[in-house]
Amino acid sequence: MSLSEPKPHAPTPDTAQQRTPVTLKALARMAREGTPFACLAAYDATTARWLERGGVHCILAGDSAAEVILGLPRTAEMPLEVSIALTAAVKRGAPNTVIMADLPFGSYHESDEQAVRTATRYIREARADIVKLEADASFSSTVAHVTRAGIPVCAHVGSLPQRAALTSGYTSAGRSADAAIEIIKDALALEAAGATMLLIEAVPPLVTEALLARTRIPIIGIGAGTAAHGQILVVNDLLGLTDAPPRFAEPAEALGARIQAAGQTWANRVKERNIGGQAYTMPAEQADLFRNRLAHLDETTRDKPSS
């Protein structure tokens, strides 16, 4: 099978256009009914369009773009303006999918008012459906203010990538009884503050199951077992584009190797002057006219004295 040949089961643009829009209410209904929903973090319109066609219910325009798109060393370095632009691109690519904005580090920490201003920009400028922020119980007031402004909030608990600098790198969470209890307390406080949804990251499945039994809002898991209402991965990890993916991220494809092979094929084609495809043509009479005019141009240029 060639790189350009679609797999037999791949959705076509015609069938993709028939998709019913997914909403936050639809995700809540799926959670109540015990139907898992699929989420992925993605960062551009083209990828978002294909994910929507593939049936993904929610796309997070994650601050992980700092690393996988911008090449920065940490998610905490994600620029706000770039994040808003990428979120808007994802929304344009997948208009019938729930789009979750990821508030960057420093864009909501100064005050509740700053958080409302930042969240409002994502809703207005990027047309996001919901905003996500990394939080513990101390951010309950922030969640309450943003929610009171009419903006749905997904509270991110467990392992918090934006705080990696405090933990000397990305790490799991909730692996001791005390740590697990703190995560449960955080989540309950954030739900009480008005969070529409929770995302729990890199915790033992036991912690996720305990949280599910004590909350009434949808929970998305990443590296948190299989029990959560929804599951999310970074699309680069799913596609095999990451050199060292997290232990919980099993690739569904090996696109990194295929992209590398395609690059090698193109380099060889260019070297051999055999780039493929079809060249544009010129009608014979126009080609003759062009040659005549080109000869005249050459003669005129040749006779022109040099300065």
Predicted regions located by residue number:
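Alpha/beta enzyme core
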Residues: 2-307
